[in-house]
Amino acid sequence: MRLSRYFLPVMKETPADAQIISHKLMLRAGMIRQTAAGIYAWLPLGLRVLRRIEKIIREEQARAGALELLMPTLQTADLWRESGRYDAYGPEMLRIKDRHNRELLYGPTNEEMITALIRDNLQSYRDLPRIFYHIQWKFRDEVRPRFGVMRGREFLMKDAYSFDIDETAGRHNYNRMFVAYLNSFSRLGLRAIPMQADTGPIGGDLSHEFIVLAPNGESDVFYHSNWEQPTRHIEADFDDPKALQSIVNDHISDYAATDEKRDPLREAQAGDKLRQSRGIEVGHIFFFGTKYSKPMGFTLPGPDGKPIPIQMGSYGIGISRLLGAIIEASHDDNGIIWPEAVAPYHVGLINLRIDDENCRAIADSLYQRLEAAGIDTLYDDRNERGGAKFATMDLIGLPWQVVIGPKGAEKGVVELKNRASGEKQTISVEDAFNLLTAGHQQR
């Protein structure tokens, strides 16, 4: 994409109402613009990152055996009255009436809807187990929306729901999602630590939240130094309950807790390996058994023909929030540093002198070759000062920058910069092309 044809309204100054780094950088990098309190329009650069995050999450959900569907944003109040949560949920739920005076709500969560949907379309215990998920925008009327997409009123969520005939099978599906979340966050370039959590209004007796360490996190977290080791993708047989349980056990054996769940005994055992930091919740999973199936009459005939209440779990990832968390965990004084897996473009190509015929010929040719090789490239072909072009590329955080200037063009060389390390090297155009395409083929 040529930057001269792109919509990238970068800002030199940070708006006064932006308090945390992710909010500041998303505004300055032209990723979002606020349209109302806690509600944002996603501009082309921000939307590309959202889509890349969605793709990874979809792949890991499918690997764990989940099926994608899509539920509407509007729900009937009657569904929530079935579960008993309509009056209990509070003012965060936006309630409306249609022209026929029917009560509706803008879904803050989907347990009731998915329960009714699956209840009315399964016939027997042989139809289980099942995991369904969807990715949809939600609305919660936060009393004080702040911190940009980290605590907005409208946000994009991935919600999954599991359905099982007994608790043993239900915990197997819980472990499927536990491992799928570890792999999702690892692929996104994040170290997410699973921590035992309260179930809150969702309910149930088993819950973990996944916390990303970040200096500007929203809460204190305490953890064993083993969690500072590099993350890795977990090769798992999702159909093997014992193997999955072993993986889960390995990942909860080292101490990690939020401030509310601290354990003085385990902290004493950790000794000088105990660490304290700030963290951001990016995922939350629950196993709540029959909390929704019983009041909503969701039973299926078991092997003996007798009705059995269905065991359920729910599993959420805040996708728009996750984007903010990635920035909080990966930035410097000059801007964002995107992990390669989610970067909106892989390469930022800078032509320092568009009026120089040699520069333009080399830049145009390299741009066309990179695009043909499947390398997403943002080509800065604007008639701007070099300093402004460098600042823009550092701000938006693309993994690689290729700089073409008049002196280098005469010699057939370019400057290649790695955004994360800051390392620069002067190499031939051909070597730069080979390096960038080789890295693409390895991913």
UniProtKB/Swiss-Prot annotation:
Location in or out of the cell: Cytoplasm
Reaction catalyzed: tRNA(Pro) + L-proline + ATP = L-prolyl-tRNA(Pro) + AMP + diphosphate
Any single GO CC term annotated in Swiss-Prot or TrEMBL for this entry: cytosol
Keyword Ligase: yes
Keyword Cell inner membrane among record annotations: no
Signal peptide: none
Gene Ontology molecular-function annotations: ATP binding; proline-tRNA ligase activity
One BP term from GO: prolyl-tRNA aminoacylation
PROSITE patterns the record matches: AA_TRNA_LIGASE_II
Listed EC numbers: 6.1.1.15
Principal location class: cytoplasm
InterPro entries: aa-tRNA-synt_IIb, aa-tRNA-synth_II, aa-tRNA-synth_II/BPL/LPL, Anticodon-bd, Anticodon-bd_dom_sf, Pro-tRNA-ligase_IIa, Pro-tRNA-synth_IIa_bac-type, Pro-tRNA_synthetase
Domain of life per record: Bacteria
Keyword set, alphabetical order: Aminoacyl-tRNA synthetase, ATP-binding, Cytoplasm, Ligase, Nucleotide-binding, Protein biosynthesis
Assembly, per entry: Homodimer.
Protein function: Catalyzes the attachment of proline to tRNA(Pro) in a two-step reaction: proline is first activated by ATP to form Pro-AMP and then transferred to the acceptor end of tRNA(Pro).
Alphabetized HAMAP family for the sequence: Pro_tRNA_synth_type2 (MF_01570)
Family, per entry: Belongs to the class-II aminoacyl-tRNA synthetase family. ProS type 2 subfamily.
UniProt xrefs under NCBIfam families: PRK12325.1, proS_fam_II
The protein's name: Proline--tRNA ligase
The gene coding this protein: proS
